[in-house]
UniProtKB/Swiss-Prot annotation:
CDD domains: Pep_deformylase. GO terms for molecular function: metal ion binding; peptide deformylase activity. Its EC number is 3.5.1.88. It holds the Pfam family Pep_deformylase. This is Peptide deformylase. Its cofactor is Fe(2+).
Amino acid sequence: MLRELVIYGDERLQKVSEKIEKIDDEILTLIDDMFETMYKERGVGLAAVQIGVLKRLVVISVPDFDDEEKPDFKLALINPEIIWHNDETESLEEGCLSFPEIRDDVARYTQIKVKYLDREGNEQILDAENYIAKVLQHEIDHTNGISFIDRLESYQKRRLKRELKELRNNTVRGIKKVNNREMLKNS
């Protein structure tokens, strides 16, 4: 089922997500919904908080840019945690489904190790590098209440200030309208 994206300005994006204690049908359905939503929105990664669910859950589907015949690297990570990273960073342009049309360069580690649970509840360790490592860091940040704009340098934030303010104001106005409709319905 398609889910609605949470957009910048919504306070949920700044909250730390809760650890998933039990992998049940509800979590498995959530994973499927996240993949469906991510594909529809043409993303390569999605954290549960981006659809309003404050659970430590991330899905990714990353193409192999060197071999278009290869299938995408597709993975659901439950309770993901970066347990190691190298010291080398690379700055590449990032965007985010929760920040429509806003992009900028973000420095990320080029190699990481991620501990997570798979769909069956088995603990896994993933060695990731380059683009996959970048996508994972971006999505795991979301589970910790961190958005890619929090990783920007101050000069980058100043450059994007107007666009971010407009996006936040539009989101806040939309949330207020929904809340007002809910209050009217319940009175």
